[in-house]
């Protein structure tokens, strides 16, 4: 198993770990209450959602997974959401502005690194080079379910 597979497995595990308290165990003798979903990211079409930003994503009942392809100098503006966000940089490097210990700081996150944003912690991204970013959000981002982009994504610039 390669490193990316391990990180993806960890991200998926984290996605559902916070929801196991209410999980129902189904056996062959019980009625299934959830639908198993199976996706192939390679077969999914990326959608351009901002200047230099492409996204493909899916969601289950409790969380979602997203792959962002960021061109060098792409920018995701300052925003926050009521979802925990786990970001794994698969390739490339980003500069992130966020708040740690009550202080606004900048941190660079490169290939193989992970940063976790608790719910409602503001953050902003700049791609320092071409970057592939895997994000997991729990719960599902309700603002992404509509066809309309969130306001902060309408302000993306390169």
Per-range role (PLM):
Residues 21-67, 130, 148-158:
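A short, N-terminal "cap"/entry segment at the start of jelly-roll beta-barrel domains
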Residues 66-80:
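Conserved short histidine dyad/triad with adjacent acidic residue
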Residues 9-18:
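Bacterial N-terminal signal peptides
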Residues 75-76, 95, 114-124:
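Histidine-centered metal-chelating micro-motifs
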Residues 101-119:
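Short acidic-glycine-tyrosine-enriched beta hairpin
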Residues 82-95, 99:
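Glycine- and acidic-residue-biased ligand/ion/polar-headgroup-sensing regions
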Residues 1-7:
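Bacterial N-terminal signal peptides that target proteins for export
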Residues 119-143:
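Ligand-binding loop in jelly-roll beta-barrel domains
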């Amino acid at each position: 198993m390669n490193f990316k597979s391990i990180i993806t497995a960890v991200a998926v595990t984290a996605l559902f770990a916070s929801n196991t308290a209410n999980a129902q165990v189904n056996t062959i003798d019980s009625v299934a209450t959830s639908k198993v979903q199976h996706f192939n990211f390679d077969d999914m079409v990326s959608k351009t959602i901002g200047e230099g930003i492409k996204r493909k994503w899916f969601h289950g009942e409790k969380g979602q997974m997203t792959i962002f392809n960021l061109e060098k100098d792409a920018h995701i503006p300052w925003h926050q959401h009521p979802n925990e966000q786990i970001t794994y940089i698969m390739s490339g490097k980003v500069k992130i502005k966020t708040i740690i210990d009550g202080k606004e700081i900048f941190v660079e996150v490169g290939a193989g690194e992970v940063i976790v944003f608790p719910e409602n912690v503001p953050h902003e991204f700049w791609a320092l080079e071409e970057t592939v970013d895997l994000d997991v959000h729990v719960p599902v981002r309700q603002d992404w379910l509509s066809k309309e982009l969130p306001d902060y994504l309408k302000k993306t610039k390169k």
